[in-house]
Amino acid sequence: GKDALLGSLSFLFDEKYMELEAQLSDFATRYEQLIYLNQELFSMIENSISLDLLARLLSTQLITKGEKHLLDRNRYYYKLLRRIIREGQDGGEFRTDLSVNEMVKLYAIAERALLYDWCICNGEYSLKTYGSTAMPIYLAQIRIWDI
């Protein structure tokens, strides 16, 4: 029932990432790839996911004792982020004093924080536009700037 619907939202997000992955080679840096993924996901959420459904997904992740779909490390989302961040580290673009998994967690926390805020503010601002300001600020902390 409701749990399956909420779980399918995570699946929908992952399907979007699979679709977007084909465009990643258009970007010169892994940083730009992460910003692109965030912007496209936030655009999809803002334009085609009901605020109520997203709020339910986020709230059930807080109270559930069962599956935490958003945190499932086997999701395509996490696999793609790990690959991009590992490549960024290997290419000298991202800092190496943090592990790939730590940086993936930081990125995912930043996205969830923005989604949560957008929900509790009842979508009163553009998620995509705010994300385009906030995510570069957050990602500046993992980026090496002298490349």
Descriptions of predicted regions:
Residues 15-18, 47, 65-91, 101-105, ...:
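Amphipathic alpha-helical packing segments from all-alpha helical-bundle domains
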Residues 45-65:
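Amphipathic alpha-helical segments used for helix-helix packing
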Residues 1-7:
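HTH DNA-binding helix-turn interface
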Residues 35-36, 40-43, 79, 83-91, ...:
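C-terminal peripheral helix-coil segments that are non-catalytic and often amphipathic
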Residues 8, 12, 19-49, 100, ...:
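Hydrophobic alpha-helical connector segments
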Residues 113-117:
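Structural signal for membrane-spanning alpha-helices in multi-pass inner-membrane proteins
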